[in-house]
Amino acid sequence: MSKQQRRKGNAKNASSASAHGYLAQGGENFVGLTPEMNIFEMASSNRLSNFSGIDDETRIVMRKLTKKDCQTREKGLRELTNIIAETSSIENCYEHFCGLVPQLSTDGSPTVRLLTMKTITLFLVKLEKSACKGLKKIIPMVLFARCDVTNGVAAAAGAVIRDGFEADKKQKVIQLFAPLVFEMAAKIVQGKHDLSVPVEYDASEDREARKSRLETQSLNVFLSYIKEFGADSTIWEEEARKLFENIAFLKMVFGGTNAALKVQVLNLAYRFKNNVEVILNTPSIVTYIQNHLDSQTFTPECSTAWEGMIILLPSAQFHTKVSLQNGIYPRFLNVIRKKGNHWRVLQHFLLPAVVLLLKEMGSLENNMKVLGTIMESFTDNLPWPTDASINAVLSWFNAFSDFVRWILTNDRINLVVWEKLHPLIVTVTEQAMTFPTKEIAECVTDLLQWIIELKTINEADVSTLLLNIESKIVGAGTENSRLIKHLLTEPGKNIVLSNLHANLLSSPELVDFQIIKNLSCSENDYFNATSQKISNFSFIEKTENFDITQAGDIVRLIKLLLENQEIKSLNISVKNDHVGRRLLLTGGSTIWNKLLKNVPVSTFQNMINYWHEKRNGTAIADAVSFLKEMGVEMDTKQAAENVEFLITLLRKMKSTDVSNEAEKNVLILKLFTAIFESDEDAKSEHYNCLSEHLTSDFNSGQFFEKLFASSEEYDIERILETACRVDKLIDLCEEQTRQNIVNNVLLSGKQCGTIIEQFQFLELEVMSCSTKPTVISTTHQHCYSHLDEHKAKEIVTESARIALFNISSKCECFFLISHEQFFFSDYNSAHQVFGWQVISIISALEKRYSLVALTEELQRSRREIEERLIRSDEVRFKLDDSSPCIFLADAYDMSFEQKKKYIQCQAEPSKVPEHALEVLYRENQTPLDFLMNVFEGGYQMFDFDRSKNYHWMINLMFVKKCIQYGGSIFVAEESGLRDYALCGIVTVLDIHKRSTLQQSTDILGNTPNAFDEDPRLEALTTLFIELYLVLNDSIKNDNHPTQTIEEWKEFYVPTINSLFIRMFRMIRKEQQPTPFVRTLLKAMFTLVEFPTNVPNDSVVTREFVPELSVFKYSLLEESFIAQAFILLSSNVEHVQLIGYAAAKLLVPIMFKTENPQVLDDDQDETEIMVANRSKLNLPVMISKSYPVDHIHKHVGPLLLSLAILPLETTKEFVLNQEQRVAYCDAIDSFFKNALNALMLDQPFDFSQVPIVCKIRKQMYFFQFRYSSHFFTAKSQEREYYLQSDLTASPLFFEKFASRLLFKSITLLPAAVRLFHKNIPNNFKPIFQEVVTKHASKLLIENELNKVQNAEFGEVLKVRTVPVTGQIISEYTVEDTKMKLTIELPRDYPLSVPAMNLDKAIVKGDRAKKWLLQLNAYLFHQNGAILEGIEMWKRNVDKGIEGAEDCTICMMTVHQQTNQLPKVKCKQCKNRFHSNCLVSSFHTYKWFESSNQSTCPLCRNNFT
């Protein structure tokens, strides 16, 4: 729908317009209107006629302009502007609009008036000459609107004239229509115009508001015209004079309360050429002027009255009507005596008015009397009121100053009036000291200075004046007189004021720093005149009273006073204060001889120590140099690191003797150290000074290596900034010495090699993990010394800092512009090589300690180094070295010749066969090609000569290619290759002896440190374990033939798993996470049960554990259990996890071995034991291994995971309900401690804050980071809580903790609920939030899914409502249904489910018992929802079947065991629950309470 159609539709729906249409169609007129009709619109129709010649849409819009609601009128004007813009023929519309302009341009709504002006502009611009016929109606209203009280409307009206007419016609238009405007304005003011009465439909303002607005606007029409065209134009006077001839109007104006209207009328009267006559003919105006000379309002009444008085005073006609002596003069005195806001106006009009008054009053003698009285009136009614405006007060002071200046410059009256002026000036000065404003003080002091410089008054009178003012200053006090004192003593003042200045300085109660400073900055004549008159110098002798900003002026004054030979009484004691230190820095023979010579050396030392604390080296150097010249030696050790101090000393070293060279070199090295150790960058002059003193033999003493050797985390930006500082320094050095300085400052190639040698133990990571052909040097055949995690990360971090620093410096490379290529010097290539090696080392470190994330510094360092590395020929040439580093070989792809040369070099004394080299380093061969070449080449594989490196190389590369080929080995076309590779795994790892080969397991069994002694063996073993894991994953996840899968599971898996267990037995507690340890951990996590084929000879030594000896463990079991829990207490997390993985396999054995009787499946349910049944026990090693401290931070959660394993329903653990309850009781105490460790003691990023905070933070992090990707918060929750991710990564323990928390609330909901109840209040809300937001909804979802997927038979139908968390169970018997509703709360299990039972089909008390039993099961006994429903169903089943209740507990199903009464009395045949007869789990213990074993009913003996 177009805009035009929408307007038509809107107009059609308008109520008044529709009504008008209905009237027109029915032939009705306006007679008989109902109250619902718009009478204002009907009345306006007469004015609008029939709108002939315009379309319906325009007609409707025009009618909106007469609506009562101003918003409708505004809308109509906007629609009208759209019509004007869109329609070409608008003449008829223009004619009708012209009739509405008078009402619209004076409308009560400013918006309507504004839019009216804009609409007129559009009409004039579009119609141009065609608009002439309506100008007589429009332009007068436009000119009237130019004076609108709303600025926006006035501006829009001005735009009508500006845009609607050509430039040369604008003035003519205004002049042409001005008389009409004046006539209309005059009538509106007098209330004789139609527009002065509100229009019926205008409800925007009331009558009085409209009247006031239009009166103001009308008078503004006259005043604005006069302002624009000047008073010479008289066309306005005819209509304006009518206003002053209208007595009623004038009485209304001056008798009313509209002050603005009065001011406008007065201003208009002043503009007449015969203004005095107009004013005098209107008595109310004269009276108004006299009465408002002291008006206190903030309106312009007062200024307008004084303007009229200035007009009237010279007029003789005014003198005949008003007496100057008896009328005006007394009125002036009253106005001057009055202290109020009228002085803001009086300042500008009083002096001209007084001058006119004196001129008209006649004789000089009379004038002197009048003038004296006027001046005395200034000081009447003092002091000023406290609430007086400060602007008014300042105006009073300015007016007085103007009068004094006028009087003293008038030779006729100045000396005559001086006697009266003198005390008045003193009084005014005293009054100025009561106002703490600088403007008032400046007014008075400028007047005094002017009087002194005028020289009209003799010196004696001036001195008397100043003495009187000084006495007033003393009387006012220090604070009140502060501004006056400062201004009177300012530099540049007349020397006459020196007496006052000296007296102020000599008075301790009046002097302050500004007065002292004014003296120190004064000119010589003034200074000498003042200083000679000072009688007391105590103001400067107490130097401790001055701060550091004042010390400079004080020292300058002291120096001036010391140089003045006539001053003898100065007594200053130099101390370690701001003035004393400034005196020392100022120096000079005069200060030294008169003040500093006898100062103790300790005082000077204290000054130097102070500057050292403030890091002001320049001051120290200046002071030390001056004192040294004076023969005083000072201790400057503390300032040795201050750059300014060192630079200043270097610059002061004038001598170049050999004896000073050593001292100079020490200073240069100290300056070098200070610049680069400073947190802030040095200034350019610092670098310039250092570069001037650096020579080619400068030795930094490995400064930067020491600088970066810090164990604390270092800011990468600081390293880069340090490199930039080096570049700045090198750029400033002389060209012939620059390269030598670079060589001495940056790291040399030899030094780089020395650093890399520290990381030989990490070369094992490259051999085991790199997919590239690995170089093996002779060093790999020797024992590695593995560093612990802390030390390893520390030295890698230091090396990364050094590498980044060296490679970031731009001075390490230069360009050959002609070839447009980089060329590196030996140093630069060494730094590049070092950088490549360091990033490889960082990656190796990251792999080794994979459970802990690299520090932010190491990650950032690696990125920054990588960005600056360049693959160049110079770096590749380093590979030609006879012993290239394995890190560099891994980072770069060696050429065939390089590889061949290197292998041959390492294979001495025998050469490597050419075909072997071809196999190893053939270009572009796939993993399968390599495997086939090795398989068909007849090389020594698995059982090889270990003295030859190339045999190791072939074996290592073979297994790496097998890993790359992966599960495809199973489907290789050459079946022999598959068998060859699979048998190779067993061959390398198996315990059997083949010829002279001793396999990995044998070697470890005989020599546990064998891998450390020969790293190649560890690399090979690691890779074959990794190959097994890759193939095992392929069997699980890929589609392979059934025969292949069965062969794998029946032969390879059991054999290799037993080898893993034997390898675990050889793991040492202190062993570092080498590739073998990490890979073995992965392998241990793949085992689902403890292998049964582990030979007993795996037990080499037996560690006696007293707690285990009481149970029937085999020697092998006891040995492995002891080993697993020993590893749990390791400080190495990977070793801890190996112990945990083994313990997890051993828990089923431990649980069954330590609870043999309770877990006996053959026990007769009906058999009753007199003695209490044995409780289930937590495996003793779990409770024994619980840490008593927080050294091993992960042990608690790991043990908790082991402890709750029996509660999981698996092949190893199938506990009935009674056993579950018994085991929950057994682990209750342990669970509380372990859960507390899980929640509170995990030191991730928060100290003394629950681990759940970390979990919550992690969830929010993922939700924020991946909100726009496929990673959602929900998927992260499932990953953390539901998936058992055993991948060794920095997130391992976070995910482990999350999963363990979820398992805990799933298996032990009641225990978790109790834990939440008892944790400290400050942790409780956090724990509640995390469980509710993340874990609860997943737990509820799991519980509902279990119930949904369960089968309950035909009689019980169960459905779930996921939205509300409800489970509805309906038990049906014939046509009757009993419904049980369980509703899980949002924070389940922290809150218990709500349960409701409807339509019980048994007795109410029995149904209630069932519900109470279900509630107790879920609330206290860690019961699952599904098991609770099954228990309730069994109760109902038995109740329906008529099973008898146990007569002890009166229940059919036992509350805890969920068993029916099965123990039968042989005499009475009644059945009882066995736990009711003998149990520690229940309140009913009949045999205990009765102290006999008889039947509760027939008393027959059970035994």
Swiss-Prot record:
A cellular component term, taken from the record's GO annotations: RQC complex
SMART domains in UniProt: RING
Pfam families: LTN1_E3_ligase_5th, UBC_like
Organism of provenance: Caenorhabditis briggsae
Single biological process term from Gene Ontology: protein ubiquitination
Listed SUPFAM superfamilies: RING/U-box
Residue spans of the HEAT repeats: 52-89, 93-129, 133-170, 280-318, 323-345, 346-384, 552-589, 640-663, 664-700, 845-882, 1022-1065, 1078-1117, 1141-1183, 1302-1340
Superkingdom of source: Eukaryota
Entry similarity comment: Belongs to the LTN1 family.
Function comment: E3 ubiquitin-protein ligase. Component of the ribosome quality control complex (RQC), a ribosome-associated complex that mediates ubiquitination and extraction of incompletely synthesized nascent chains for proteasomal degradation. Ubiquitination leads to vcp/p97 recruitment for extraction and degradation of the incomplete translation product.
Zinc finger intervals, RING-type: 1446-1499
Reactions accelerated catalytically: S-ubiquitinyl-[E2 ubiquitin-conjugating enzyme]-L-cysteine + [acceptor protein]-L-lysine = [E2 ubiquitin-conjugating enzyme]-L-cysteine + N(6)-ubiquitinyl-[acceptor protein]-L-lysine
The name this protein goes by in its record: E3 ubiquitin-protein ligase listerin
Pathways involved: Protein modification; protein ubiquitination
Location within or outside the cell: Cytoplasm, Cytosol
EC number: 2.3.2.27
PROSITE patterns named among the record's database cross-references: ZF_RING_2
Subunit structure as annotated in this protein's UniProt entry: Component of the ribosome quality control complex (RQC), composed of at least the E3 ubiquitin ligase ltn1 and nemf. The complex probably also contains tcf25 as well as vcp/p97 and its ubiquitin-binding cofactors. RQC forms a stable complex with 60S ribosomal subunits.
GO MF term list: ribosomal large subunit binding; ubiquitin protein ligase activity; zinc ion binding
